[in-house]
């Protein structure tokens, strides 16, 4: 294999591209492009001029972690011991209705903050699911002082919201 110079290689690429009518690839952008991009796209201070490209500072808001994922049986027992009201969502990652109702659960966790909301993946923690006879996903169990009060089987938002509202502590 012979070694050729870079200019010779570029010449051969160009001649191949022109002979087969293929578009010539842009091999190396001008450094001026990077300089102008650095001035406009990465400028964190707000722009005061009325130019075509404007910059904007971004702030992110911390996400509320109001629904907690439990990964073992001990976490489940601790949650029941440490909170007066606990709503448990038994779900599976492959379950479509579980994914569909998850945003509603997060919304209700903000509206009814005195209930502790937890999720238990039945594939990761099967012993807890078996202990409470979970046969379908999603299954929601409401606990008060560590004792099961009620349950809702299936993604039924009106029934679940009624359960939460009826058992929500006032303080």
UniProtKB/Swiss-Prot annotation:
Function, as annotated: Thioredoxin involved in responses to oxidative and cell wall stresses. Plays an important role in appressorium formation on hyphal tips. TRX2 may affect invasive growth via the MST11-MST7-PMK1 pathway since it is required for the proper folding or dimerization of MAPKK MST7.
Matches recorded under NCBIfam families: thioredoxin
Molecular functions per Gene Ontology: protein-disulfide reductase activity
Cell compartment(s), UniProt: Cytoplasm; Vacuole
Keyword flag Disulfide bond: yes
Disulphides: 95-98
Record family assignment: Belongs to the thioredoxin family.
The protein's name in its UniProt record: Thioredoxin-2
Chief location bin: cytoplasm
Pfam families documented for this protein: Thioredoxin
Domain of life: Eukaryota
Any one GO cellular component localisation term in the record: vacuole
Gene induction: Expression is induced in the absence of TRX1.
Gene that specifies this protein: TRX2
PROSITE patterns hit by this protein: THIOREDOXIN_1, THIOREDOXIN_2
Keyword vocabulary terms for this entry: Cytoplasm, Disulfide bond, Vacuole
Thioredoxin domain location: 41-169
Consequence of gene loss (knockout): Leads to reduced growth rate and reduced conidiation and impairs appressorium formation. Leads also to defects in response to light/ dark transitions.
């Amino acid at each position: 294999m012979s070694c050729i110079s870079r200019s010779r290689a570029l010449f051969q690429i160009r001649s191949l591209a022109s002979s087969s009518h293929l578009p010539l690839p842009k091999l190396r952008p001008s450094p001026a492009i990077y300089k102008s991009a650095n001035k406009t796209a990465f400028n964190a201070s707000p722009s005061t001029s009325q130019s075509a490209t404007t910059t904007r500072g971004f702030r992110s808001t911390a996400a509320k972690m109001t629904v907690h994922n439990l990964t073992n049986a001990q976490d489940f027992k601790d949650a029941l011991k440490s909170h007066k009201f606990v709503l448990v969502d038994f779900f599976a990652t492959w379950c479509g209705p579980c994914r569909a109702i998850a945003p509603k659960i997060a919304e209700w966790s903000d509206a009814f903050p005195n209930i502790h909301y937890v999720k238990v993946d039945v594939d990761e923690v099967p012993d807890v699911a078996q202990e409470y006879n979970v046969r379908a996903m999603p299954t929601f169990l409401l606990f008060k002082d560590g004792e099961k009060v009620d349950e809702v089987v299936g993604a039924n938002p009106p029934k679940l919201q009624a359960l939460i509202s009826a058992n929500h502590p006032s303080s």
